[in-house]
Amino acid sequence: MRNGGVKYRDNDKSASKISDYQSDEAEIKLRYERNYTTLPIKLNFGAGIKYSNYVNDVYRLQFSSGNVVPFQYHSSIDLLSYQAFVQASDQYLNNRFKVSLGVNLVGNTFTASMSNPIKQLSPRLSLSYSFSDDFDLNANIGHYAMPPSYTTMGYRNTEGNYVNRSNGLKYITSNQAIVGMEYHPGNFLRFSLEGFYKQYSHYPISLTDGISLASKGVDYGQVGDEAVMSTGDGRAYGVEVVAKLMGWRDIDLTASYTLFRSEFTDKNGIYRPSSWDTRHILNLTTSYKLPKGWYISARWRYIGGAPYSPIDVERSTNKAAWSITNQAYTDYERFNTLRLADAHQLDVRLDKEFYFKHWMLNLYLDVQNAYISNMPSKPIYTNRDTEGRVMDDPTSPDTKQLLRTLVYYSGTILPTVGIMIKF
C-alpha cells in the first residue's frame, strides 16, 4: 500500500515544497486455524506470522527555535510479527447460559519488549444468560494489545536514529468491560441497555507537543511521524440505550442514545478530552415500505459539541512560522479546552426498486442536511484583510502579523441521485 502527499508554498506548484512524503507498506501473511465442533466443548485455535516491509521518505519544513529549518529522512524497516490464539466455548442449563473463554498472544521484532508475547498476553471472557425467551443478559471482559503504526516505528531523527525504538516503544494495551441486557417482547419490539468501560495503557505521547497520538487527526498530516514515548493512558466509558420497532406494518423505527466520555493523558498525566469526545449522540431513524417497490427513509442526528483548542498566538503571528503551514498553530498547553456548540442534521432518502429475472435495479434520491442546519466548526484564522492583503503588525512589520477570525459553518444541503444494480 502506498501513501503520499506534497504541499507547496501558497499551493503554487512552481514554488518551493513545504512538505513531501511517500510511504510504502508490503505484507506477507501465513495463518493456520483449526476448529473442533465434535468435542465436549467447541474449540478454536491457530497461529500466524506476518512479514512486513515499510519504507518512508519524508521532507518537510519545521519551525524550531525561531527559525525555519528543513527536516528530511529515509527509513526502511523489516518486521516479523507473530500470533497464537485459542478459544473455547460451551452452553449450559438447556443452552440458556453461554460461556466463551479465549487467550491471544502477539509480538513482533521491533523492540525487545514487543518481541516477548507474554507481555502482550490477552485473555478475554464472554458470558450470556437467557432469563426467558425475551430477556437476555450479556457481559464481556478482556485485555487487548495493538501494535503502534508503521509510521511511528519508522520515524528517524536528524541523526538517522530510529528514536522510538530507543525510547522503548510498546504495544498499546486496553482493558475492556461491557455489560448489557436485551428485552424483546413479541415479534416487533426490541430494547437494549449497555454500559462499557475501556482503559488504555502505553499510548504513544508526542515528545514535541506533549499530547496523545490518539487525539491527533488528519489536521496534523502524517500522524505518528515523530518522536514519542509509550507513557500515555486513556479511558472511555458510557452507556447506550436502543429501542427498535422492526417490520410492524412495513415500518421500521430505531432510536438510540449514547452518553459517554473519551479522554487521554498528556505529557503531565492530565486527562484531556479526545478529539471525538462529543459526550452524547442521539440517532432517530425510520423507514417505510410503500407499494410498488417504493421506500422512504429518514435519519435525524443530534451530536454534542466536539472539543477544540485555542491557538498559540505567539507562534501563529510569527510570519516565518505561518509560512510553513499557512494556518494558525495549536496551543497544546490548552489542548481541547474549548468546545463547539451541539449540532443536528436530518437526512432523507427515497428509493425505487425494479425487479427483473436475474437482477434488480435501484434508483434513489438522497438528501443530506435536508433543512440546512448550520453545523458549527472551529474558528479559522487568516493573516489577510478583506482585500487579500497581509496584515502586518505595526510593532514589528517585518517579522510579525495580525490575525482575524473567520467563523465557518458547514450548513450545505447535499442532494445525491444514484443507481444501484444487483445480480
Task: Locate each region found by the language model.
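C-terminal beta-signal and adjacent terminal beta-strands/loops
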Residues: R301-T325, A341-Q345, K352-F423
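Structural signature of Gram-negative outer-membrane beta-barrels, strongest in the C-terminal barrel
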Residues: P40, H74-S201, S256, I281, ...
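Face-selective signature of the C-terminal outer-membrane beta-barrel domain
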Residues: M1-M114, S130, L189-S192, T254
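Surface-exposed extracellular loop regions of Gram-negative outer-membrane beta-barrel proteins
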Residues: R60-Q62, Y129, D134-A177, Y197-Q222, ...
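Transmembrane beta-barrel strands of outer-membrane/channel proteins
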Residues: M1-N3, F45-Y51, L101-G107, A139-H143, ...
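Outer-membrane beta-barrel channels and translocator barrels
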Residues: T37-I41, Y92-N95, S130-D134, S174, ...
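Gram-negative outer-membrane beta-barrel transporters
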Residues: Y92-L93, Y197-Q199, Y220-P310
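Outer membrane beta-barrel strand-and-loop segments of large Gram-negative receptors
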Residues: S19-N35, Q72-Y73, I77-F85, S166, ...
